[in-house]
């Protein structure tokens, strides 16, 4: 069985790093529409712990995960996990 790599998205919430397709800033209009569509299809996961949403993570299962961390922080964490292999 292979080891699973977990990406910390804030407040002790984690996502399987291999399933992440995109990390985007939450303010863009297309991302807001994506967020609304995910909510309608019950594929929206709020991992902000009541804080302001700064990043939106899209997974290969079409789930949209909201994070209060900056997109650059999440991207850096993903790069570090990928570099470790």
Annotate each PLM feature:
Residues 17-25:
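Phosphoinositide-dependent membrane-docking surfaces
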Residues 46-60:
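Short, structured protein-protein interaction patches enriched in aromatics and acidic/basic residues
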Residues 1-15:
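Short aromatic-glycine motifs in intrinsically disordered, low-complexity regions
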Residues 56-85:
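C-terminal structural segments of small proteins and small subunits
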Residues 15-18, 44:
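Structural recognition of short helix-loop-helix hairpins that underlie histone-fold modules
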Residues 14, 26-31, 40, 61-64, ...:
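Short, charged/polar surface micro-motifs in flexible loops or helix N-caps
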Residues 30-49:
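Compact, glycine-rich, soluble single-domain proteins
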